[in-house]
């Protein structure tokens, strides 16, 4: 007797597939590919998750006792890396707006990074390792050629009410709330990366999560190889990046807004970060050498990647000053108000909502 399998993606898309109980998980993946398309859902890149476990290809569907009232989560990892070189990403032809400041081109060292096609021989387990592979879950890396790349960079990082929704969705996969919260925190609220952490192990967790044997073996590989190829290495000595890292470690929810601001003021750098998101997150997780004042990040996001350290002060119009004063009247420290105001692109209402949604500790 045929059964109906309900499947849901991390983008909240739901669809159904009819299966015979004796058909294997591999057959289910093939049916998903046939219905949703080989480019979006290749069999080799699919991971099916039910009750917190990855379904094995050669196991019949009946063995997992999937309740038709529940759903199976579909994740897709990038396995066909050659697609990145065969055709440009779909994008709007309009380029991202440039800031009035002249930005230097991204360092050529970033372009010497091995092309994706050179890594086609790697196994899917290597591509899903959270700390050693530059590949990431499909959809988690913003499109580098999009006119709205700063919005793309922030769109995969959820905050506010979306955070609670995504938290509930991931918990529905069979994970406890505490583990999901820890995974989201480690991934800076990136739901795709959080699920990867739940499957392969949360960085800094005392006990590794139970992923596949291959994934655990890959995670043990030394990170020196990836570090040696890091095209964002030049950021380490940038005082603006060091301040940004300190602020984000204190308040991870600021990352989407800061990335969006960076995309407006330095789109070339955001494009490079988008191509190497894994290394960028690793650098943000590194402990800072010196504790920076949280106010030091004000106005400096756009200066990251430049050689102009003179951007230490910002000028505000009388209207902007009045908005800052009104936000201060809500009871928040001036440094936090300024930080939130500029991180939210001088949107007073958005900044107020952000400040009220955070639990800042006055220093």
UniProtKB/Swiss-Prot annotation:
It is found in: Nucleus. Changing residue 77 to E: Impairs UBL-UBA domain interaction and enhances ubiquitin-binding. Changing residue 8 to A: No effect on interaction with EEF1A1. Residues 319-363 are annotated as: HIV-1 vpr binding. Residues 1-81 form the Ubiquitin-like domain. There is a cross-link at residue 122 (Glycyl lysine isopeptide (Lys-Gly) (interchain with G-Cter in ubiquitin)). GO terms for molecular function: damaged DNA binding; kinase binding; polyubiquitin modification-dependent protein binding; proteasome binding; single-stranded DNA binding; ubiquitin binding; ubiquitin-specific protease binding. Changing residue 47 to E: Impairs UBL-UBA domain interaction and enhances ubiquitin-binding. InterPro entries: Rad23, RAD23A/B_UBA1, STI1_HS-bd, UBA, UBA-like_sf, Ubiquitin-like_dom, Ubiquitin-like_domsf, XPC-bd. Pfam families: UBA (PF00627), ubiquitin (PF00240), XPC-binding (PF09280). GO terms for biological process: nucleotide-excision repair; positive regulation of cell cycle; positive regulation of proteasomal ubiquitin-dependent protein catabolic process; positive regulation of viral genome replication; proteasome-mediated ubiquitin-dependent protein catabolic process; protein destabilization; regulation of proteasomal ubiquitin-dependent protein catabolic process. Multiubiquitin chain receptor involved in modulation of proteasomal degradation. Binds to 'Lys-48'-linked polyubiquitin chains in a length-dependent manner and with a lower affinity to 'Lys-63'-linked polyubiquitin chains. Proposed to be capable to bind simultaneously to the 26S proteasome and to polyubiquitinated substrates and to deliver ubiquitinated proteins to the proteasome. This is UV excision repair protein RAD23 homolog A. It comes from Homo sapiens (Human). The gene is RAD23A.
């Amino acid at each position: 007797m045929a059964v109906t399998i309900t499947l849901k993606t991390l983008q909240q898309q739901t669809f159904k597939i009819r299966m015979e109980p004796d058909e294997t998980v591999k057959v289910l993946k093939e049916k998903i590919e046939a219905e949703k398309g080989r480019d979006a859902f290749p069999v080799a890149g699919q991971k099916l998750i039910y009750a917190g476990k990855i379904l094995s290809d050669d196991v019949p569907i009946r063995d997992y006792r999937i309740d038709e009232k529940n759903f199976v989560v579909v994740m897709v990892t990038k396995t066909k890396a050659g697609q990145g070189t065969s055709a440009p990403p779909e994008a709007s032809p309009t380029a991202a707006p440039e800031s009035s400041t002249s930005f230097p081109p991204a360092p050529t060292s970033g372009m010497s990074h091995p092309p994706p096609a050179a890594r086609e021989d790697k196994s899917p387990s290597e591509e899903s390792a959270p700390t050693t592979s530059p590949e990431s879950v499909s959809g988690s890396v913003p499109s580098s050629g999009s006119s709205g790349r700063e919005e793309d960079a922030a769109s995969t990082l959820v905050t506010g009410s979306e955070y609670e929704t995504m938290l509930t969705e991931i918990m529905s996969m069979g994970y406890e709330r505490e583990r999901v919260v820890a995974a989201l925190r480690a991934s800076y609220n990136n739901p795709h990366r959080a699920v990867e952490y739940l499957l392969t192990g949360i960085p800094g967790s005392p006990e590794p999560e139970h992923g596949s044997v291959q994934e655990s073996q890959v995670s043990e590989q030394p990170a020196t190889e990836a570090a040696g190829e890091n095209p964002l290495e030049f950021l380490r000595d940038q005082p603006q990046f060091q301040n940004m890292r300190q602020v984000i470690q204190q308040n991870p929810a600021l990352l989407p807004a800061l990335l969006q601001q960076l995309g407006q003021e330095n789109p070339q750098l955001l494009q490079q970060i988008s191509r190497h998101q894994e290394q960028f997150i690793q650098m943000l997780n590194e402990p800072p050498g010196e504790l920076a004042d949280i106010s030091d990040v004000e106005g400096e996001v756009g200066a990251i990647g430049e050689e102009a350290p003179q951007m230490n002060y910002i000028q505000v119009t009388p209207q902007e000053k009045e908005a800052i004063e009104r936000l201060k009247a809500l009871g928040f420290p001036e440094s936090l108000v300024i930080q939130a105001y500029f991180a939210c692109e001088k949107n007073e209402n958005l900044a107020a909502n952000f400040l009220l949604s955070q639990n800042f500790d006055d220093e």
